[in-house]
């Protein structure tokens, strides 16, 4: 067997199927498992997806939120077992794949228009 097919077989078993469709500009709730000593708890991180990167098992996404007036960004692996679930709360309409310009904006200027969805 070739190296590539072995790698594909191993990674395809690790891929998650419960991931909703989301893209840059969408507001998501990420339920991440946090280990503190011997305890494990779920921490909610809600914010705007500012980028998606990679494909397959290496895919990641970065979520940005404002906490106490300070911008906080967190990058999650898309297929990580440490992420319990992802919920999309708003679908944003943007014309860029990477929303790094949001870092320089604050308040109402950082708002994202909502995308219309067909039912």
UniProtKB/Swiss-Prot annotation:
PROSITE patterns: RIBOSOMAL_L19 (PS01015)
An example molecular function term from Gene Ontology annotations: structural constituent of ribosome
GO cellular component terms given for this protein: cytosolic large ribosomal subunit
Keyword Acyltransferase: no
GO biological process: translation
UniProtKB keywords: Ribonucleoprotein, Ribosomal protein
Family note: Belongs to the bacterial ribosomal protein bL19 family.
Protein name: Large ribosomal subunit protein bL19
Record organism: Leuconostoc mesenteroides subsp. mesenteroides (strain ATCC 8293 / DSM 20343 / BCRC 11652 / CCM 1803 / JCM 6124 / NCDO 523 / NBRC 100496 / NCIMB 8023 / NCTC 12954 / NRRL B-1118 / 37Y)
Gene giving rise to this polypeptide: rplS
